[in-house]
């Protein structure tokens, strides 16, 4: 399992994109020689700091079968100061700091917490979120995926599992040339319905 976790809401959709890229490029049932292998790491999207509270119990104490990839931002577009109005409450220590400081402290402390449980992590740091840096990030992740495909010995540029469901949809919707597939598909659907699926 491979977790992509940016600590910036502006990078939230990088995780969505990466999950799609990683799954369709590396989830294969045949290697380049045609051997049946059923391979591919499962990508998971997360957003820091939100998903620390929804997923990290599993990541820290569950099976050690995940790599967590953090994306940090060094310089945010805006700086939001935390006011000192809460001095006499349990969160008074935050007064005078920034939300940017808090976000990076969340990323760093979460990474250390994972290391306490011997969980592997990777951190990518972006100087800032702009077209130049995001383009470099996307390109690096594309190259990473291509290299992973070579290591898994699979064709990263095909997606037969996706094509199959597209063809089934064409058949169900009556696209010309898919009449035989429609008949076969109706039989399969009836069989699944009888099993209660």
Predicted regions: what they are:
Residues 1-197:
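A SIS-like phosphosugar-recognition module
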């Amino acid at each position: 399992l491979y977790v992509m976790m940016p600590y910036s809401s502006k990078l939230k959709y990088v995780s969505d994109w990466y999950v799609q890229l990683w799954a369709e490029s590396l989830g294969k049932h045949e290697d380049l020689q045609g051997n049946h292998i059923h391979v591919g790491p499962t990508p998971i999207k997360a957003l820091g700091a939100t998903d620390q509270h929804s997923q990290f119990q599993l990541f820290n104490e569950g099976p050690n079968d995940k790599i967590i990839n953090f994306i940090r931002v060094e310089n945010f577009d805006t700086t939001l100061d935390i006011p000192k109005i809460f001095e006499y409450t349990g969160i008074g220590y935050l007064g005078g700091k920034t939300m940017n400081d808090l976000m990076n402290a969340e990323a760093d402390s979460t990474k250390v917490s994972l290391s306490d449980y011997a969980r592997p992590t990777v951190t990518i740091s972006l100087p800032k979120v702009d077209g130049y840096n995001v383009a470099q990030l996307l390109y690096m992740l594309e190259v990473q995926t291509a290299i992973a495909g070579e290591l898994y010995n699979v064709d990263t540029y095909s997606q037969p599992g996706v094509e199959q469901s597209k063809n089934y949809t064409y058949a169900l919707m009556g696209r010309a040339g898919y009449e035989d597939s429609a008949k076969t598909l109706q039989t399969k659907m009836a069989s699944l319905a009888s099993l209660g699926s």
